Curated annotation (Swiss-Prot):
A cellular-component GO term for this protein: cytoplasm
Name of protein: Xanthine phosphoribosyltransferase
Matches recorded under InterPro entries: PRibTrfase_dom, PRTase-like, Pur/Pyrimidine_PRTase, Xanthine_PRibTrfase
Originating gene: xpt
Cited NCBIfam families: PRK09219.1, XPRTase
Length: 192
């Protein structure tokens, strides 16, 4: 998605450890117009799939997931990372290691929001080592839900995340695919 790539080039900051900071429009401050355009693109890419629900992990996956849900007219569920007084039992859970935060969270989804009748589209902000997506896969497997596809805003193709998805035979669509951060610059796949 050219618009997203341009925004990453303009506002993204490469940090040590192959981390891309996109706080200007995705991970702290949100650009709703850009999120909506991403939602439209995910909806276009997955329009022929029989999806009943969109699922993501809090918190940065929520904005693109909600916009995709808005365009596709589908409910959105997000896996919670933190315990809550309102979310205590009857949960699907999975442990997820965060590449950028270097911590393990137990994500959870209330069983009433994900069932074996669901055909889900996973939407998330980044795909690096694939741990968040693997956690969602674990939750969907426990629920008996069918995973129809994964939509990623920014994929780092030089890390292992895509392999986890492809090994499952699940369709992956990424709006921006980064091939490297050479010289602290973002380089996209297909660039010369």
């Amino acid at each position: 998605m050219k618009l997203l790539e341009e925004r990453i080039k303009k506002d993204g900051v490469v940090l040590p450890g192959n981390v891309l900071k996109v706080n200007q429009f995705l991970n702290h401050q949100i650009d709703p117009e850009l999120m909506y355009k991403m939602g439209e693109e995910f909806a276009r890419l997955f329009k022929d799939e029989e999806i009943t629900k969109i699922i993501t992990v809090e918190s940065s996956g929520i904005a693109p997931a909600v916009m995709t849900g808005l365009v596709m007219k589908l409910p959105v569920v997000f896996a919670r990372k933190h315990k809550s007084l309102t979310l205590v039992d009857n949960l699907y859970t999975s442990d997820v290691y965060s590449y950028t935060k270097k911590v393990t969270n137990t994500i959870s989804v209330d069983k009433k929001f994900l069932t074996s009748d669901d055909k889900v589209l996973v939407i998330d902000d980044f795909l690096a080592n694939g741990q968040a997506v693997q956690g969602i896969f674990n939750i969907c497997d426990a629920a008996g839900a069918e995973i129809k596809g994964v939509g990623i805003v920014i994929e780092k193709s030089f890390q292992e995340g895509a392999k986890i998805i492809h090994d499952r035979g699940v369709r992956l669509e990424s709006l921006a695919v980064i091939s490297s951060f050479d010289d602290n610059q973002v380089h996209f796949e297909g660039e010369e």
